């Protein structure tokens, strides 16, 4: 009997060892991919934007400004800490990853052409880059890129899913906050109906921003980049990361809504 059990135990040990190795590989590879792709830097930029007076004003509505500001600051810090969001995103993506596919993603992100484009995006996401971006977007609004270049930028936006991601992020946040605060169903049901309008409002800004970010990049290169982002392994990686991040934002926004309910919930009588 013991002799018969040995092959079974050996197989189980090998399977456990393989699973542990893949788990460790996925954690390391996911960390690399999130760093190389610039998504961790994007999280830092987003959390900084959430703490801005402009964003808080959007949420405040007709509430007393000082009371709302004092209430929301610690809640934002707790639920939307960049460090916590990066760690949670990495853990969730790593739990869903295929080690070989993630290895291919890391290799692709390190390829010369993709690395060059990512470097341009990283420069834009810096504090200095954001200030420059806003200045040049204002100029681009009065003197927009040529039709051919805008067509290439639209194709890149479609492949990269940037406008969709920005829209989904904002919808998840507002839906989460209102859900947590106990908003009535008829109000929550209106949010998905506004998605097309919300995306249209952001798309022009996103694509003008791209024209600044990729200034000096030729039209064929923009189309090449769009092609890379719309095929494996990058397509699967970015889709997974963005979907997972939007889910995290929705969950944390609900928690934020519950914390803010005493000051943003409508009176019951």
Regions inferred by a protein language model and the residue ranges of each:
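Immediate post-signal-peptide N-terminus of mature secreted/exported proteins
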Residues: 22-56, 142-165
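Bacterial N-terminal signal peptides that target proteins for export
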Residues: 1-9
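Extended amphipathic alpha-helical interaction segments
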Residues: 123-215, 219
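Acidic/His-rich structured neighborhood in mature extracellular/periplasmic domains
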Residues: 75, 79-155, 159
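A cross-kingdom marker for long, charged
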Residues: 199-200, 204-269
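N-terminal signal peptide c-region/cleavage motif recognized by signal peptidases
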Residues: 16-21
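N-terminal, post-signal-peptide region of Sec/Tat-exported proteins
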Residues: 44-81
């Amino acid at each position: 009997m013991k002799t018969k059990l040995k092959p079974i135990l050996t197989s189980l040990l090998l399977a456990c060892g393989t699973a542990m190795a893949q788990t460790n590989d996925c954690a390391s590879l996911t960390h690399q991919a999130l760093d190389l792709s610039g998504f961790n830097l994007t999280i830092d930029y987003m959390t900084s934007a959430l703490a801005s007076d402009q964003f808080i004003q959007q949420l405040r509505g007709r509430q007393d400004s000082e009371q709302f500001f004092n209430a929301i600051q610690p809640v934002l810090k707790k639920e939307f800490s960049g460090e916590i969001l990066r760690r949670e995103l990495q853990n969730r993506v790593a739990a869903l990853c295929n080690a070989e596919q993630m290895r291919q993603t890391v290799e692709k992100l390190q390829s010369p052409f993709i690395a060059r484009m990512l470097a341009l995006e990283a420069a834009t996401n810096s504090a200095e880059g954001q200030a420059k971006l806003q200045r040049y977007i204002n100029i681009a609004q009065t003197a927009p890129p040529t039709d051919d270049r805008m067509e290439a930028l639209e194709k890149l936006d479609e492949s990269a899913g940037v406008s969709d991601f920005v829209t989904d992020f904002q919808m998840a946040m507002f839906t989460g906050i209102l859900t947590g605060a106990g908003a009535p169903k008829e109000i929550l049901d209106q949010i998905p109906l506004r998605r097309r309008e919300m995306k249209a409002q952001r798309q022009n800004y996103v694509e003008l921003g791209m024209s600044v970010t990729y200034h000096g990049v030729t039209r064929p290169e923009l189309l090449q980049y769009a092609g890379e982002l719309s095929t494996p392994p990058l397509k699967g990686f970015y889709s997974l990361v963005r979907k997972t991040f939007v889910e995290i934002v929705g969950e944390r926004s609900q928690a934020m809504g519950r914390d803010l309910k005493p000051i943003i919930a409508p009176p019951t009588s």
